[in-house]
A protein has these predicted regions:
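Single-stranded RNA-binding regions, centering on S1/OB-family and related RNA-binding modules
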Residues: 1-277
Length: 277
């Protein structure tokens, strides 16, 4: 069964001068214009296409890859605004994505980059976007373990820190003391559960917490040293940015960890890096 608003692998069932027709199952045949048809395509081949409804409400196919499919979040640029709402570039050249005014948490201006959730409007059947995320998140209590790895999408910034969507289901918060490296709205990254409070709110960390944090980083450092021939140009004098790029951890945690490895006799700390002992 094909899925509108998502990428599907469809069979070529007919060729024409202006393109090929794909098997759209219950929707019948779907035209893929020549500009989207891969060279050498033959009958019976399967092509990965994104399916959506065009401006005339006809089912259309494209090989363009959307920034976000139905059920996903993505950072998108506002291309224009009219009396209907804001239109964003979601990666499909033939048609921008509409965010109706009723689905906007704030009024936007052209040129802004905003985080958008893509969904299918049940009343009209159209694929649209929203910046009102609460109704798409799970309201049931979260069941996470401390130090459990999760997928994060940075959604908002406030005085408290960064609000993030956890595994596409729950809200979580990264407090300033747990922020290192560059974070921005729409960034997708791995994180860890710091704690789930009694009121259900989730505190997040970008690295494991407690003893597990140090043990995990120690293993990563030794593993990378072995891969790099026993030397890494990163020591306790290296920049926080360089350390984060290599290990996604803070400089403070890195310094403590290599200090521990040094005391254990596993590494030697040199003026320009660290070396396996």
């Amino acid at each position: 069964m094909i899925k509108i608003g998502q990428i599907n692998s469809l069979e070529v069932i007919k060729k024409a001068d202006f393109g090929v027709f794909l098997d759209g199952d219950d929707y019948g045949s779907v035209l893929l214009p020549n500009k989207h048809v891969p060279e050498g395509t033959e009958l019976g081949d399967h092509i990965e296409v994104f399916l959506y409804f065009d401006s005339e409400s006809q089912l259309a196919a494209t090989i363009d890859k959307p920034i976000a499919q139905v059920g996903e979040w993505g950072l998108m640029k506002i291309e224009g605004i009219n009396q209907t709402g804001a239109f964003v570039n979601w990666g499909i050249k033939e048609k921008d994505l509409l965010i109706p005014f009723s689905e906007q948490r704030a009024r936007f201006t052209a040129g802004q980059n905003i985080l958008v959730y893509v969904y299918t409007d049940k009343a009209s059947g159209r694929i649209v976007g929203t910046t009102k995320f609460n109704k798409w998140l799970d309201k049931t209590p979260a069941n996470y373990e401390v130090n459990e790895e999760v997928d994060l999408i940075i959604a908002e910034r406030s005085q408290l820190g960064y609000k993030a969507i956890v595994n596409g289901k729950h809200w979580g918060m990264i407090f300033p003391s747990d922020v290192f490296g560059k974070l921005f709205i729409g960034k997708k990254l791995k994180g860890y559960i710091k704690q789930v409070r009694e009121d259900g709110k989730i505190d997040l960390s970008l690295q494991k917490v407690g003893v597990a944090k140090m043990d995990d980083l120690s293993s990563k450092i030794i593993e990378l040293l072995e891969k790099k021939g026993g030397f890494l140009p990163l020591n306790d004098k290296s920049s926080p940015e360089a350390i984060f790029d290599a290990f996604r951890t803070s400089k403070g945690t890195y310094k403590k960890t290599i200090g521990g490895l040094y005391k254990q006799g596993k590494i030697v700390i040199e003026k320009d890096g660290i070396r396996l002992a």
